[in-house]
Amino acid sequence: MSSFTHFNDQGRAKMVDISDKKATVRTAIACSSIVVTKEIYDKISHNEIGKGDVLAVAQIAGIMAAKRTSDIIPMCHPLLLKGVDVSFDWKQSDEQYRLLIEVKVKTEGSTGVEMEALTAASATALTVYDMCKAVDKGMIIGETYLLEKTGGKSGDYTRKS
């Protein structure tokens, strides 16, 4: 494992200088999920949540979060993103309804987009919670994790199952 690079000679936090790094195509895929009741699942599926189309709003929130990651994660560089795609898939078992969230982010630049993908996945799940909390506050936001990344000096990464 490499050493931490976000500290200066005095041991204080710094933003890493990436000006000498080569610009390459970089991608990241992050996942999250939220478990909801059958009632919420039905209301989302039939667009009956009072605040509006939950998945459309959550999708936009995820895209906005990816674009604004450097505003909330202190050491992230502002990036010109080339694309952000938020997708959903429902998984049901018994009376448990899990909304799976997958976010793909792409750029061509000097640093990766892992944090943008992770931030987007988190914000997407949080937005679903916010829009549905009037129906039930017992929703559970699941694990948020990096599934895959490509490009950059550290090479490609794929999460092992």
UniProtKB/Swiss-Prot annotation:
One of its GO terms (biological process) is Mo-molybdopterin cofactor biosynthetic process. The active site is at D130. NCBIfam families: moaC, PRK09364.1. Belongs to the MoaC family. Its EC number is 4.6.1.17. Pathway: Cofactor biosynthesis; molybdopterin biosynthesis. Catalyzes the conversion of (8S)-3',8-cyclo-7,8-dihydroguanosine 5'-triphosphate to cyclic pyranopterin monophosphate (cPMP). It catalyses: (8S)-3',8-cyclo-7,8-dihydroguanosine 5'-triphosphate = cyclic pyranopterin phosphate + diphosphate. CDD domains: MoaC_PE. This is Cyclic pyranopterin monophosphate synthase. It holds the Pfam family MoaC. Disulfide bonds: none annotated. The gene is moaC. InterPro entries: MoaC, MoaC_bact/euk, MoaC_sf, MoCo_biosynth_MoaA/MoaC, Mopterin_CF_biosynth-C_dom. One of its GO terms (molecular function) is cyclic pyranopterin monophosphate synthase activity. Homohexamer; trimer of dimers. Keywords: Lyase, Molybdenum cofactor biosynthesis. Substrate binds at M75, C76, H77, M115, E116.
